Amino acid sequence: MDKRWSLQGMNALVTGGTKGIGEAVVEELSILGARVHTCARDETQLQERLREWQEKGFQVTTSICDVSLREQREKLMETVSSLFQGKLNILVNNVGTLMLKPTTEYTAEEFSFLMATNLDSAFHISQLAHPLLKASGSGSIVLMSSIAGVVHVGVGSIYGATKGAMNQLARNLACEWASDNIRTNAICPWLITTPLISDLLSVEEMKKEAEERTPMGRVGEANEVSPLVAFLCLPAASYITGQVICVDGGLTVNGFSYQPHA
């Protein structure tokens, strides 16, 4: 295989890799030859996924981590540094959560929790990973954002704020760390069939309206996001950095079009 299209010999960290987009990303990177470490809060899920990945022949290791907690993030990066001998090629900050409420009803605790889980974790883990990414000689960071950081989609103002901040973080790190040969990009999915939004998609009226407003006429799947993550980490993408890329079936570019019936 052309080395531009292979991750053979590369090390990757994917946060929240036991389900949804994170699980798809772990598998995508593994298929392309990367050695992957992933973390999650649920030990049972970690063990279940690990067995599945081992059966597929993937080089995956796991550890328990709640990325909303600073001390656990520090412990995670110590583990990763030890596993990969102080070098990391790929960091995918994938963990995220949402809480649907009117803005006036959020508590201070809920604000802090969403900020810690979505934004603080991505910022701090990127900070901690910097020396490892630099040591690898060629690093790639992918921030899993959302179109809620680009346009209003009614999934909560705090969630949207965290994702908008992640998009700008990707741009800033791309410029600041370019001299260290570290690239940073953000990916902004729309509705993707994952456990995180299963309750939303179970509301038939909501799902129908979302599909009608999406030019491609459907919600996405996790394995339609993971290939983009993998591509951005490939040597073939070596000149792509600071980009915020929407994976949304065309939603964010859709204005208004009237198609008269024949």
From Swiss-Prot:
Coiled coil: none annotated. Its EC number is 1.1.1.-. InterPro entries: NAD(P)-bd_dom_sf (IPR036291), Sc_DH/Rdtase_CS (IPR020904), SDR_fam (IPR002347), TR (IPR045000). NADP(+) binds at residues 13-37. The active site is at Y159 (proton acceptor). Substrate binds at S146. GO terms for cellular component: peroxisome. Keywords: NADP, Oxidoreductase. One of its GO terms (molecular function) is oxidoreductase activity. Belongs to the short-chain dehydrogenases/reductases (SDR) family. SDR65C subfamily. This is Tropinone reductase homolog At2g29290. It comes from Arabidopsis thaliana (Mouse-ear cress). The lineage of its organism: Eukaryota, Viridiplantae, Streptophyta, Embryophyta, Tracheophyta.
